[in-house]
Amino acid sequence: MAPVKKLVAKGGKKKKQVLKFTLDCTHPVEDRIMDEANSEQFLQERIKVNGKARNLGGGAVTIERSKSKITVTSEVPFSKRYLKYLTKKYLKKNNLHDWLRVVANSKESYELRYFQINQDEEEEEDED
């Protein structure tokens, strides 16, 4: 049998990867149908780190609010999709799911937009 070579990684430690995602709540906050402080509190209670909610990994995940934008910064693996899932859960809990949707407007951010219902209704009336 041939000898088995073991690969040894050269170098030191891995660089910590910092993930930063933003949630833009400008339109619903300006219209006063949503409270950004309440949504920030919801995210703090629901985000799980290492399988535990309300944990936030001892500072590994931070949630900051500036005006109508919520920024989630993470040093541990955190997916953008998980932020969308929690945002949709918040909308459902507060009965806003029928009026708002979560849309990705860049690679690292989501935006809450209204459904375009008025245009659809006008088109249906024109067809009748």
UniProtKB/Swiss-Prot annotation:
Entry annotated with the keyword Ribonucleoprotein: yes
Keyword terms of this UniProt record: Cytoplasm, Heparin-binding, Phosphoprotein, Ribonucleoprotein, Ribosomal protein, RNA-binding
Annotated compartments: Cytoplasm
Pfam families (alphabetical): Ribosomal_L22e
Role this protein plays: Component of the large ribosomal subunit. The ribosome is a large ribonucleoprotein complex responsible for the synthesis of proteins in the cell.
Subunit and partners: Component of the large ribosomal subunit.
Protein name per Swiss-Prot or TrEMBL: Large ribosomal subunit protein eL22
Taxonomic classification: Eukaryota, Metazoa, Chordata, Craniata, Vertebrata
